[in-house]
């Protein structure tokens, strides 16, 4: 049982507010939550917070805060599951979850909340059940066109019409407008991996972790059977390695409840009959052992003179992806000592950009080709830079420098090596139009840290 539900923007502006029981302090509770959230040290706030006799449970999704409050002694895990399900429902019915989308569909969001929760008690979170009661149509920013090549693919990757669907096609509502009789039968399947890496100052690998998901968004009628074929060398745990090759191994794996595993052990095929909307077909994790080299290596060189306050940092970034692959939206973030007053730079290509901001150096590289190597020479004046005793140049890093962190996106690449071999649909619509199938693979950084 929950007392209130509200959605805040990243700046704390209330977008949605619903009081189910009338036992709270009104809209001031949303402001109280954001003050407590921003008053906490660090970037990671706890998902459960308390104030007097009230509990706040929240998740962050697409830059929004989805918050539930209760004064009862309820398991926080059940409320976190409810918030996650609400985020999925909003994405299903509005097309995507974001500040602009919520603002355009306020009436639809309130109608969903009225059907999902009655006096704070959950009635249903099923997309299929709710579609019988929801009357408000979603408001989208523009009509969706599958072959609108002015759009770009997932995470900004350039796409080809015959291979990848524009990103807008996957972000439309699962329920078409009642005036739109041309609802397309489509399935979008994404293999998404988040890479966490920690590299020591001597270049040795201290930690590596891959968190992966196979995400499905289906516009087919509910219960339509589909089969997803994974890489045949895919195995779970070291004891399950098969054949003579290194195999594609993960440490842990979990499946959605709608997945049938009768063909998984023998042929690595997932069979399922999903409902309309979004779901995570499979989650997996891999630690310590990657089948391929890390996507990036950084080779830093530091020279600083305490007497003159001159700091020189030379960074060489090597991309170890295959030559036909590329990384997009690469950004290197390097914390700097306090008091930097000037920056001069020499970059290896004109597309790069570097600037100072919030006590750090930001080096942006829009596109990095696999097998390439880029460099940047940065000279800064730091008066009164603290450090070990002595004058003259030093090759040791001064206090406050580093560690460096990288953010990037790798379209059509998975760090674990897992690939979808095929996506087969048993559904056959009336007429000659076959369902459209879109499969995408991508990896992106989660925490890619290199010590200086």
Curated annotation (Swiss-Prot):
Pfam families: Adap_comp_sub, Clat_adaptor_s. Signal peptide: none annotated. InterPro entries: Adaptor_comp_med_subunit (IPR050431), AP2_Mu_C_sf (IPR036168), AP_mu_sigma_su (IPR022775), Clathrin_mu (IPR001392), Clathrin_mu_CS (IPR018240), Longin-like_dom_sf (IPR011012), MHD (IPR028565). It comes from the Eukaryota. CDD domains: AP-4_Mu4_Cterm, AP4_Mu_N. Its main location: Golgi. Residues 184-451 form the MHD domain. It is found in: Golgi apparatus, trans-Golgi network membrane; Early endosome. GO terms for cellular component: AP-4 adaptor complex; clathrin adaptor complex; cytoplasmic vesicle; cytosol; early endosome; trans-Golgi network. The keyword Protein transport applies. One of its GO terms (biological process) is autophagosome assembly. Component of the adaptor protein complex 4 (AP-4). Adaptor protein complexes are vesicle coat components involved both in vesicle formation and cargo selection. They control the vesicular transport of proteins in different trafficking pathways. AP-4 forms a non clathrin-associated coat on vesicles departing the trans-Golgi network (TGN) and may be involved in the targeting of proteins from the trans-Golgi network (TGN) to the endosomal-lysosomal system. This is AP-4 complex subunit mu-1. The lineage of its organism: Eukaryota, Metazoa, Chordata, Craniata, Vertebrata.
């Amino acid at each position: 049982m929950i007392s209130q539900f509200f959605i805040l923007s990243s700046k704390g502006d209330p977008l949605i507010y619903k009081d189910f029981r009338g036992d709270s302090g009104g809209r001031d509770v949303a402001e109280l939550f954001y003050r407590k959230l921003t008053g906490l040290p660090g970037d990671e706030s706890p998902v459960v917070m308390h104030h007097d006799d009230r509990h706040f449970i929240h998740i962050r999704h697409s830059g929004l805060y989805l918050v539930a409050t209760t004064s009862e002694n309820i398991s926080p895990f059940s409320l976190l599951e409810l918030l996650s399900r609400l985020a999925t429902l909003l994405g299903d019915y509005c097309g995507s979850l974001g500040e602009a989308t919520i603002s355009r569909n306020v009436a639809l969001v309130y109608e969903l909340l009225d059907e999902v929760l009655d006096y704070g008690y959950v009635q249903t979170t099923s997309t299929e059940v709710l579609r019988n009661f929801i009357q408000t149509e979603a408001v989208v920013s523009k009509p969706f066109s599958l072959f609108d090549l002015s759009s770009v693919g997932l995470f900004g990757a350039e796409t080809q019409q015959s291979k990848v669907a524009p990103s807008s096609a996957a972000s439309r509502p699962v329920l078409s407008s009642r005036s739109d009789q041309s609802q397309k039968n489509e399935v979008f399947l994404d293999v998404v991996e988040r890479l966490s890496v920690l590299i020591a100052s001597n270049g040795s690998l201290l930690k590596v972790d891959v968190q992966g998901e196979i995400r499905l968004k289906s516009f087919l009628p509910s219960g339509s059977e589909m089969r997803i074929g994974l890489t045949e060398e895919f195995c779970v745990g070291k004891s399950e390695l098969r054949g003579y090759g290194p195999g594609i191994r993960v440490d842990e794996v979990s499946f959605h409840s709608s997945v049938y595993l009768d063909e998984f052990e023998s042929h690595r095929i997932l069979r399922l009959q999903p409902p309309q909307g979004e779901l995570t077909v499979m989650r997996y994790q891999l630690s310590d052992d990657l089948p391929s080299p890390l996507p990036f290596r950084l080779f830093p060189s530091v020279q600083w003179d305490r007497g003159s306050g001159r700091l020189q940092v030379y960074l060489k970034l090597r991309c170890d992806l295959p030559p036909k692959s590329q990384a997009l939206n690469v950004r290197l973030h390097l914390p700097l000592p306090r008091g930097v007053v000037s920056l001069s730079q020499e970059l290896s290509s004109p597309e790069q950009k570097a600037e100072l901001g919030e006590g750090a150096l930001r080096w942006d590289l829009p596109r990095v080709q696999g097998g390439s190597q880029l460099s940047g020479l940065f000279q800064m004046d730091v008066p009164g830079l603290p450090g070990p005793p002595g004058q003259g140049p030093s090759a040791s890093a001064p206090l406050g420098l580093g560690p460096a962190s990288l953010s990037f996106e790798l379209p059509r690449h998975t760090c674990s090596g897992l690939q979808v071999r095929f996506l087969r649909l048993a559904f056959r619509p009336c007429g000659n139009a076959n369902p459209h199938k879109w499969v995408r693979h991508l990896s992106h950084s989660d925490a890619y840290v290199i010590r200086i």
